[in-house]
Amino acid sequence: MAISGRCHCGRNAFEIDGQLPEKLTRCTCSLCSKRGHLYAYYPPAKFRVTQAESDAVYRWNTKTVANHFCSACGCDLYADSPAFKQDGSWDGKTRRIAVNARLIDDFEAADRPVTVVDGKHLW
């Protein structure tokens, strides 16, 4: 079963093969804290962009994470990211897609527990 989502203006949309994970993630790094993400993680093969009319990319610090956002309405869409472990380490090859769960159709934040990752001190 696939789930879908889109930005506020609808110019960018995506589909995911699968469901919302049991837990979502909130990172405390400077970028995620300011943007208010709740992330749902997926392997790249399970995620596809179905519309990208105003997709823009922001990279910072080590430039290893591509943060996609809508240049029209400003919604954060997803990040193509290393598959960081809880301690901040990475194997150098495995990637994941961190979807802003708030954009998933019919998403209810209260329905899922949230794990906090201490990105403020890890990277």
Language model: regions and residue ranges:
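A short Gly-Trp-Pro
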Residues: 1-123
